[in-house]
From Swiss-Prot:
InterPro entries: Nitroreductase, Nitroreductase-like, Nitroreductase_HadB/RutE, RutE-like. Coiled coil: none annotated. SUPFAM superfamilies: FMN-dependent nitroreductase-like. This is Putative NADH dehydrogenase/NAD(P)H nitroreductase Smal_0358. Keywords: Flavoprotein, FMN, NAD, NADP, Oxidoreductase. It comes from the Bacteria. One of its GO terms (molecular function) is oxidoreductase activity. The keyword GTP-binding does not apply.
Length: 196
């Protein structure tokens, strides 16, 4: 079923991909954002919980709602990015499990207070956010993930009255290499991993 991707594909996804701090003044069409989600949705999550919820912030009005929640260091680049994705997670994700995981009563595993679902929601929602970054790169987009923002303000502006909470943000577009910092090091296998 599977075969290894070639070196060029691995470079595009990982080795030469960079976290972008600046983007070209080139719009990202809504059809490409839909194509992006249609890739992301196939990424695995525990019991197919798929708790992530995505808001693609593209309009000036929506950016203005987001702006007060951004840290100073993330403000200008986010306002200039063609798209900012709010990666959220739905604490009531289990309500969809009769459809998403029909061969057993998985909904019952998560019935009870929302706090009991938080760990599964944020863990699997974070997975889906990572899939979004890789899917964006696979489609020729560049990404700049960020955690410097006030989650309570984002939740009030975009998720008020819902069971959805914000997790992190990702700027998307076509990267401007002029805004890149020098490539930073990564930990070696021996520093970060072991075989047990």
């Amino acid at each position: 079923m599977s075969h290894a991707l070639d070196a060029a594909a691995l470079d595009q996804l990982f080795r030469t991909a960079r976290t972008q701090n600046g983007f070209l003044d080139k719009p990202v069409p809504a059809s490409l954002l839909q194509e992006l989600y249609d890739l992301v949705k196939w990424g695995p999550t525990a019991a197919n919980t798929t708790p992530a919820r995505f808001v693609f912030v593209t309009s000036k009005e929506a950016k203005a709602k987001l702006a007060p929640a951004l840290s100073e260091g993330n403000h200008d680049k986010t306002m200039a990015a063609p798209v900012t994705v709010i990666i959220g997670f739905d604490l009531d994700f289990h309500e969809k499990l009769p459809y998403l995981f029909p061969h057993t009563d998985a909904k019952a595993w998560f019935d009870g207070p929302q706090e009991g679902r938080h760990e599964a929601a944020i863990r699997n929602g974070s997975l889906q956010g990572a899939y979004l970054i890789l899917a964006a790169r696979a489609l020729g987009l560049d990404a700049g993930p960020m955690s410097g923002f006030d989650a309570a303000k984002v939740d009030e502006a975009f998720f008020a009255g819902t069971s959805i909470k914000s997790n992190f943000l990702v700027n998307l577009g076509y990267g401007d290499s002029a805004g890149l910092f020098p490539r930073l090091p990564r930990l070696s296998f021996d520093e970060a991993a072991r075989i047990a």
